[in-house]
Structures are given as structure tokens and as C-alpha cells.
């Protein structure tokens, strides 16, 4: 009976300190033999509360693990929080709320990454339960964090638990995929709707269609996407710009050199195929005509990739 009473008191103490936003006091408590129960209490509260609840038990659990030097568990708690927020993101009623949830989700992924990088490379992983009740239902809970005892029976799904090993590279990929979607939402607001199909591989053609080749390149590198469409579209831009240059040069062949340079410069500036050069911070300081800068842009990126032979074949096929 005394053990049950002690357990109840410890549980009440933990929840009371959390509700009073006294996390520092909780972390300073010298309750060595009760640390496992404190961790179970915080984990239970985090699992059964809304990811937007205050106090945020996921953040408290993260601080608890960090204070004990357990960066693996700290990362796992924030990864779970990010996925809970992902459910809210899919069901967000408006673009503004979706962006707000997605920003919080990205922050949780980033905190998870920061915890994992503190570990040796061989230990930068954790196990994640794919049968998480909230993720399985696809609906956020309306309940606030539970108070009181946590020793009541909690039904578990039938069958063995489905565990996934999550590595640092996996979290980084999810983080960059989310940032990419947030960036694309500025141009394509329909991506904010949960019913809109979204795959990371779709980001590259969307950036290319928007003449944002810098973003397309960085996204392809971060997410390790094939760049076939990038080099194919870029080669076509180069060809069209060079053809337009020679056509303009022939048109103004008999004009005064000063006027010819002025006319051709104005038309190059207005050429829609040169829009990607105007958007790129890299090409802003490059001298030369638009087609010369475009070919240089292609060459620089071709030399920067590890699959130059494959992409040279794509460029050659476009030029034939």
C-alpha cells in the first residue's frame, strides 16, 4: 500500500510541476530510484495529449532526457512530436494553420537532428513505433494531458508492435522534404491541402517550371533526387537563348553598334527563357550575354555532380 501511495504522490508531483511550468524544478529533483517512474509518467502524458497542449509534455520529456545525457531518447521524443504535428498538418482547415503546424513540425525535426548529431555516427538512431495510436487513427485527440495516476490499463493494438529504425539521415530527409513543401506553398498554395498528392520527387519539376533552378538544384542535392529533368530543361533553355541571340543579332546587323547593344540588351532582359538567370543569385555577377551565362550555369552544375556521364548523355540527346 505504501508503494502505491508513493507512486501516486510522485505522479501528482510530476504533473503538478509540469502544469505550473516548473520544469527546472522537476529536473533538479533528487529522486534517483524514481527516475524510471518519472520518465513513464512524462511519456504517458505526452502520448495522450494533443501536440499543441500546454504544457508540452514532449518538450518536457526532451528536456528530461537531455538533462540525463540520453540524447537518443530525447531525439525519439521530438521525432514523435513532429509526427503528431504532421497529423494536424494534414487536417488543417486553412493555409495559415497548415503553415503554422508545418513550421512547428520542422522545428521538432530540427531539435531531433540536433540531439542525434551529439551522438557518435554509429549510435545516431532510435526505434520508432509505427503503430502509434494517433498516427494510426489519423486524427488528433481533443483531450488535454491526463492528470493523476498513470497505472491504469491502456489497451494496446493486437499483434506485435511495428518498430522502425530511424537514422539521422532519415530525419534530415523528412526535415528537408517539409521545408521544400513549405517553400513551394508560396507559389502553389494547393499543396497546403491534405488531399493534394505530394511526393518529394515532384519538387524538382515544380521548381524548374517556376524558373527557380537554384532551388531545384539544392533540393535535388538534399533529397538525393535524380536530376535528369533539371539538366534536360536547362539545356533547352540554353539552346533557346542562343537561337534568340543569333536571331536578334541578324535583325540588328545594320544598326549602330551602340543602338544594337542597347536593343539586344533590352530584348534579352525581357526574354522569358532568361528568367531563371534573373532569379539566380549566382549568375548576377557573371558578365556576358544571356546564352553565355546560361551555358556557364549548365557547365558549373554539370561539373558539380557525381553523375556527369549520365547527365552529359541527356544533354547530348537534347542537342541532337
What does each of the following model-derived ranges do?
Residues 1-320:
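Extended alpha-helical assembly domains of large eukaryotic scaffold proteins
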